[in-house]
């Protein structure tokens, strides 16, 4: 039996039956803690899904991690730059979310920007390409150069 802390517990409560069915685990919710029990592989997949949900992804997007070659990666912005976090996040998001949307479209990944982290869900190779693009943007590359990755 595994247990994790989840920030978006309301969404999990609403969709508990669907999550249990798709992940093949039994879920118990106490406060903001989610316990789940099942086969070891199912528990591992559930831990990835709950980590993605806690990061801020929707349940529908997080359940894509159930697909075999999909992965979830978190990039910590502070590890790659000393600049002001607000400025770096502005570069990542772009005008009206255009840069983030282009990264998502080109890489075929789901990209979400949190307070000081960037989360990416998608096929393994696509996630690596998106990570390279995001890290280059964080370090100061021009958006046009980043789109080549």
Question: At which residue positions do the language-model features occur?
Answer:
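Predominantly single-stranded RNA-binding modules in RNA-associated proteins
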Residues: 1-149
């Amino acid at each position: 039996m595994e247990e994790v802390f989840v920030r978006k517990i309301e969404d999990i409560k609403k969709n508990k039956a669907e999550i249990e069915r798709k992940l093949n685990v039994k879920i118990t919710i106490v406060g903001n803690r989610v316990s789940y029990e099942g086969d070891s592989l199912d528990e591992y997949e559930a831990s990835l899904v709950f980590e993605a949900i806690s990061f801020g992804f929707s349940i529908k997007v997080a359940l894509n991690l159930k697909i075999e070659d999909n992965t979830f990666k978190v990039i910590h912005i502070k590890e790659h730059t000393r600049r002001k976090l607000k400025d770096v996040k502005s570069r990542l998001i772009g005008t009206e979310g255009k840069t983030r949307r282009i990264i998502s479209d080109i890489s075929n990944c789901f990209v979400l920007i949190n307070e000081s982290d960037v989360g990416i869900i998608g096929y393994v190779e696509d996630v690596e390409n998106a990570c390279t693009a995001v890290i280059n943007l964080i370090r100061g590359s021009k958006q046009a150069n980043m789109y080549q990755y």
